Curated annotation (Swiss-Prot):
This protein's record includes keyword Isomerase: yes
Cofactor: K(+)
The UniProt record lists the keyword Transmembrane helix: no
Residues reported in the UniProt entry to bind K(+): N69, D133, S169
Annotated GO MF terms: metal ion binding; NAD(P)HX epimerase activity; nucleotide binding
PANTHER family in the cross-refs: NAD(P)H-HYDRATE EPIMERASE
Protein name: NAD(P)H-hydrate epimerase
Signal sequence extent: none
Organism whose genome encodes this protein: Drosophila willistoni
Top enzyme class: isomerase
Keywords: Isomerase, Metal-binding, NAD, NADP, Nucleotide-binding, Potassium
Catalysis performed (reactions): (6R)-NADHX = (6S)-NADHX; (6R)-NADPHX = (6S)-NADPHX
Stretches assigned to the YjeF N-terminal domain: 10-225
Amino acid sequence: MLKYLNQAEAIKVDQILFNEYKFSVDQLMELAGLSCAHAVAKCFPSPCQGNDDKAGKLRVLVCCGPGNNGGDGLVCARHLALMGYEPTIYYPKPTAKPLYENLHHQCELMEISTISQCPSVEEAAHSYHLIVDALFGFSFKPPVRSDFLSVMELMQQTKIPIASIDIPSGWDVEKGKLNDCELEPKLLISLTAPKLCAKHFKGQYHYLGGRFVPPALQRQYELNLPNYPGTELCVKLS
């Protein structure tokens, strides 16, 4: 049976990947973000995949937080652009570290716009077809900081479908949706292994991404991950 990780286990698995298997943060972030882009493309295909017809592209608002989840979002945005989408980044609190600065710089050179103000519910409905939620990961602890209140309000009130990376933002990593959080993504992309909160996910699509977990680590934690089909970077869980 597929294992769902609690917060301590998720942190420990990450530490083992970094310290024992010598993966770098940017290496795992690239693989994770790429798998997220593939999951998005499966669930929300753009009519203009593979061509430059900007007018017909699926417009995606990628909301990035200050940590690794936000970095995954920046990578995801870059790959979505290469796949025929038109991503726009909302990055309210950029991280002043070379890794994140470089990821954002790459997006800028690929002509991916970054907006400085969170759009209203009405503005978002007019401008975007999809929102990628890359705000908070499994290290999140409430309350939500003031920098992210407006985007959290947008994601809870919008009718636009939302794709959440690893953890729906504002959810408890183990207990799921908290009383003051109404965020209900249509797509959840669990990374490495699903977290306990994913058991409370009621959306339409649940995918697993991050095809990089060594077999010995899978056995050590009895993860029982599903087999990825062929050369796929993500696998559907439900």
